[in-house]
Amino acid sequence: MRTHGKSKRRTWRKLHLMINAETQEIVAECLTTNNVHDTVPVPGMLDEQKTPVGRFYGDGILDTWDLYGTLDQRGIEPVVPPQRNAVLTRHGNSKLPKLPRDEAIRGCRKFGRKGWKVKVGYHRRSIVETAMFRLKTIFGGRLKNRLLRNQKTESRIRCKILNHFTKLGMPKYE
């Protein structure tokens, strides 16, 4: 809040990406305003998928029951780190099936947070960070258009071009 009322220009856009971990191609993208929670575009992005999704890697902000429900309905295994103060919902003596979030909490308790991330392969999520870095390096961090619908088109075109660059060839590391 500013001294003289609300800021008029302090807004930003969030680009949500879904990456195929094998090919490193962007398979879905969604541009939202800054007041949309990160879990909101996930169902729509999953609906865009033509190939089945086996695992979903996400950062800690996606640790919500809505997301777990969405992934469970589609039969997708979530790999999302629980919040540090997370508690078990179903304990070991329950006859109900185990919840993926509870398993993540148990894993963090047993192996430590870093150990759990290594065990479940959570660091594959960094492929998305790499794609975002490549996108910003090639096209810059700003959008040219002013209207949201035009910015959505612009971001979609940028992702298509980046996919084309990816198909041409990625650097090989040894």
Model-based region annotation:
Residues 114-174:
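Basic, amphipathic alpha-helical segments enriched in Lys/Arg and hydrophobic/aromatic residues
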Residues 7-9, 78-84, 107, 165-174:
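Short, Lys/Arg-enriched charge-dense amphipathic segments
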Residues 65-136:
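Helix-centered, glycine/charged polyanion-binding patches within enzymatic domains
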Residues 1-3, 39, 44, 102, ...:
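Short secondary-structure boundary micro-motifs
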Residues 10, 97-102, 156, 167, ...:
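Intrinsically disordered and other compositionally biased segments
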Residues 1-83, 88, 136, 154-159:
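Polybasic low-complexity intrinsically disordered regions
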